[in-house]
Amino acid sequence: MLLGGSSMPRPLTLGDYTLLPDTVHRQWYVNLNEDDLSDSLQHILSEEVQRHYPGWGIIVTSLPVIAINECEGESISRYEEAHITIQLTDVRCQTQGQYYYTSTARAHWRGVTASTLEKKSYSLKLTDAADDDLDAPLLGLQEGHTFILDAMAADLGRMRNRLCFDLWNEVSTLRDSDMVANGTRGHYVELLLNGSYHGVYCLCEKVNRKLLGLKKYKVDDSADDGSQASPYRGHLYKCSRGDDLTSYLALPEDYTESSTTEWYGWDLEYPDEYPSTEAWHPLIDLFQYTMAEDTAQTLDLERLSHHFQTDNFFEYPLFNFACKMMDNAMHNTYISFRNYHKDSIAWITPWDLDGSFGRDGTSWDNSIYTASEGLSLGWVRPYRSLHDRRDSTFMAELAIRWDRWRTATFAVEHVCQHIDSMAGILVNSGAWQREVERWDSLNVMYAGIGPLHLEADLTTETTMMKEWYERNFANLDARFLPYLPQPSAITTITADAPRGMTEDHWYDATGRAIASPLSNGIYIHNGQILIRKR
């Protein structure tokens, strides 16, 4: 088959390694463990390359390498899928235990604004020989047929989206074992596109029914009362526009229903093959609640629990404040219902988090701003009114969670270490230098703002991110800690605490050290088990 409009050389296998070609620059890319990046091994591989392909060089990287080649006559675009081939090398053998994995696939550009950049992001759909969907656990991610190659082109650090998702996945509550994650996982890779080096990307999962554990659309013979049961169970909606009233979880006065996959500022992501007015009812019903709660005198947790997963409801805005999301006031956000037959509990899942940590989605430097200047959740109901009137219940629930997060996932040291770790992966693999050489020479305009210049020294960007976070951390302390409930009504149970716990320290029921017992629950302190109820 002719790929990319020209005859492409096959991968080159040298012993245990498979090398992928950059035919434009006459280089072979090989993925090795960091421990194997020795001069002697590289010399051996280089000699073998010269023997097979005189005049070609070798690029050694500790990142997996993906080669995408458009099939002859096909061209990847924004709205039309193109047939492609995918070749993946991974020294950790995370894809079905293989160092080298290959598949056919379909691809298109993803992201409305991001698709205007020369360095595109791609949506991939793996296929078999019959062009049907093919599931595979690429790089050990959730087994499926849809994946995202995130270009991170508007992020001058090439890490914000992945950094934020990693932090979110640490703190986000899971509904049960059927839910793989309430956010995507991903890994850095280096991409070869049609035989030419295309830069560093992040291969990540797509938010979908399988990741969130939503129940499938299914036709039953009858409901419990003998009537015909609705086939709709799990629902997944994506807010695709940030300029629509519905993106603030509110209904227009004269709203109409939809029987398609689009309704005002939202897309029906599942079950997208069965659009109808009924498919939109869970979201409309939720908006009825958020609008009513927006005008209530105080937040009612009991009422809230019938419409949102309670922890998730509070985790989302706090996460938004901690990372200062600039484009996630429900825009770039998913709302899902696992099984609307059983309950009407909604879950919130974030998406596209690159406008964070001191920059917005255009890489404009907004590092002077922290969570104190403006509310990054915009006018979303009921968050804005709860925050602006400093609703005591709302602020206390955020304070309780922030007090827990600030000594663990969102501790300054932990966040800064994560930033340094991601930077180390990019720099030590050589990918950052190649990324700068590939993309900083171009005058890339983004949403009318540009050019975007990458710093050769990545620490310039990471230092800005870390200094911004330290300021934001202090701001969040000042904003939320005054609303911490005072410990009260602590009951002591005569029982021995587990061994190995230090006196004068507080622990939760799982044995994890915490700052203090702030919410109702079981705690361990000074060798005793305590119950707090307020």
What residues fall within each predicted segment?
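Internal "kinase-insert"/substrate-recognition segments embedded within catalytic cores
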Residues: 128-131, 137, 141-154, 179-182, ...
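Residue-level detector of functionally pivotal "anchor" positions at catalytic/ligand-binding pockets or at interdomain
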Residues: 481-510
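Regulatory N- and C-terminal appendages and interdomain linkers associated
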Residues: 2-108, 413, 417-488
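Middle-to-C-terminal accessory/interaction subdomains
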Residues: 113, 117, 264, 268-330, ...
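A conserved alpha-helical element in kinase catalytic cores
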Residues: 155-178
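Short, well-structured beta-strand/strand-turn elements
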Residues: 171-188, 325
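C-terminal tail/sorting-segment detector
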Residues: 522-534
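A glycine-anchored, Pro-Gly-centered beta-turn/N-cap motif
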Residues: 26, 519-523
